[in-house]
Amino acid sequence: MINGKKMGLGILSYKAPETLKKTIASLEQQKAGSFFDDSVIYFNDFCDRDKEIADAFSYRAVGGPNIGFTAQQQLAEHLDADYIVLIQNDCPLIENFSELKKQLTMAVELIETGRIDLMRLRHQWHVGEGFCDVEKYAGFYNICVVNEAFIAKEHGLDEEGLKHSWVKSFKRYIRPLKARRLIGRSVYVEKSPEKLFPKYIQKTGDVLIVDSECIDYTEQSFLIQKDFFLNTLCKFINENPKKRTLHGFQVPEIILNCLWWRKKHFKIGVCKGLFTHNRFDDSFRKNHLFYNKKI
């Protein structure tokens, strides 16, 4: 509980039992569960094996048929909390308990005072697999001063990928809207993004606050007020289905990353972060080492 507000942890899971076990183990190692008032795992395609895993770690298990990432709504609804941290089964904790308490307390205070609407919790530097924000940003912008904490290999980049080029200015000229939408990604590589883009990025303490006009919504690892998540974001998702889907399922990221999101000017917090992204079995992505075509 933070300032009288209940805290909830929700994990969305589909298949990948070994990955889930490693993620839960990372939380258990730091006794993260003691920080939360409620902890729930929501299983897509819920089965007996899933419940056995949850029971083994003393997590409450809920679930149903596979409905994809939109199951985050059901996950949130099952959490008895005012603020919820939503992660996925492949998002292990990589910081200690003290850092977890510090960052989540700070995030709640920023939301309570109206400074931010959502706090991203994917680690700013140890981003894990499948993160292409910096690569895309560097395709349109020359890096001014690389942050000393930046780890190029985390992004599959080398000096060639970060070198300066006049072509980037031309790309921004012919595609100004896309260039603007990429500005928020500067927080993962630039030393002082708030000085480069003061119109869109501010800094308070160790937190960068980015206008949603130039940073995407992400389903992976974030803290948010439960009421705001359900009655604002999920409401929009449910009312605006898209033709573009993933394996036939609606995808919150596809639905929310639209003109509505950009014009709402939500304030997205980016801090050091707590969770990375690593998968060890049952990936649905064809280019993944652990791709499983049967799921």
Language-model-derived ranges and their functions:
Residues 6-8:
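Cell-envelope/extracellular polymer assembly enzymes that use nucleotide-activated donors
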Residues 16-31:
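Short, well-formed alpha-helical segments that are part of the catalytic scaffolds
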Residues 22, 174-295:
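C-terminal catalytic/acceptor-binding lobe
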Residues 27-63:
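Acidic donor-binding segment of Leloir-type glycosyltransferases
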Residues 64-79:
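Glycine-rich, basic loop-to-helix element that forms the pyrophosphate-binding segment
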Residues 84:
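Short aromatic/hydrophobic "clamp" motif used to bind/position activated sugar donors
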Residues 90-92:
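The conserved acidic donor/metal-binding loop of glycosyltransferases
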